[in-house]
Design a protein with these regions (language model features):
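A conserved beta-strand-loop-helix scaffold within acyl/acetyltransferase catalytic domains
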Residues: 1-2, 32, 36-54, 66-80, ...
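A short, internal acetyl-CoA/4′-phosphopantetheine-binding micro-motif in the GNAT/acyltransferase core
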Residues: 7-15, 27, 167-178
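Conserved catalytic-core motifs of GNAT/GCN5-like acyltransferases
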Residues: 55-62
């Protein structure tokens, strides 16, 4: 078996390095293999000092937001997707944390329908899963059509306007084609308007 840590430790470097070693010691005590998933370059040497190897599984996709827009030839596909959503009656808004509890029944229904359509269970770990207590801690981006929520994503917001990302994304089966494209384009535009530097699309 394996003991898997998601991402790197958060805190001062000297404390973080000690925590990485502590994870290795705990893995050894339990007879498990230590795995550090989705790490950056900061502590590579520490992982190598543990006797671990580095395996590249992918790269994090980052969208710079400070100059993001829909103008120009290079953004024609995005502009068309956004216009198609607007013509199809889609609208976007971000529900603040205070509003989220009242939205949870509808979000749960959307999530259940989405899972049923995918014929699977929640994945969890590196992908978000539906948990009402967890969702209620974040603003939620909503796409609506004819006054009904057709897609949503919770927002992760780094301090000081550094980074924006999403963890859980779901949509109704009958959502108009291109709904998720519309959601992400609107998120990029919203993030720029709020002063965020970048949007992480994950690996």
């Amino acid at each position: 078996g394996s003991l898997i840590a998601m991402g790197e430790p958060v805190g001062p470097p000297e404390v973080a390095r000690a925590l990485i070693w502590r994870c290795r010691e705990e893995s050894d005590r339990l007879g498990l293999r230590p795995v550090f998933y989705q790490i950056g370059e900061t502590y590579w040497q520490t992982y190598l000092d543990l006797g671990l190897g580095l395996v590249k599984l992918g790269e994090e996709a980052i969208v710079p937001l400070h100059d993001f827009g829909l103008e120009g030839r290079e953004r024609a596909d995005l502009r068309q997707a956004w216009n198609r959503g607007k013509r199809g009656g889609l609208s976007f808004r971000v529900a603040p944390v205070e509003e989220v509890p009242s939205l949870l029944p509808r979000l749960h229904a959307i999530s259940n329908a989405w899972l049923e359509d995918k014929a699977g269970d929640e994945k969890g770990f590196s992908l978000g899963s539906y948990d009402p207590d967890y969702l209620a801690r974040f603003p939620v981006a909503l796409v609506e059509a004819e006054g009904q929520i057709v897609a949503f994503a919770n927002l992760w917001q780094a301090p000081a306007g550094a980074e924006l990302s999403v963890d859980l994304m779901r949509h109704v089966n009958e959502a108009p084609k291109g709904t998720m494209d519309f959601l992400f384009i609107e998120l990029f535009l919203w993030g720029r308007s709020q002063g965020y530097a970048r949007f992480s699309l994950g690996m």
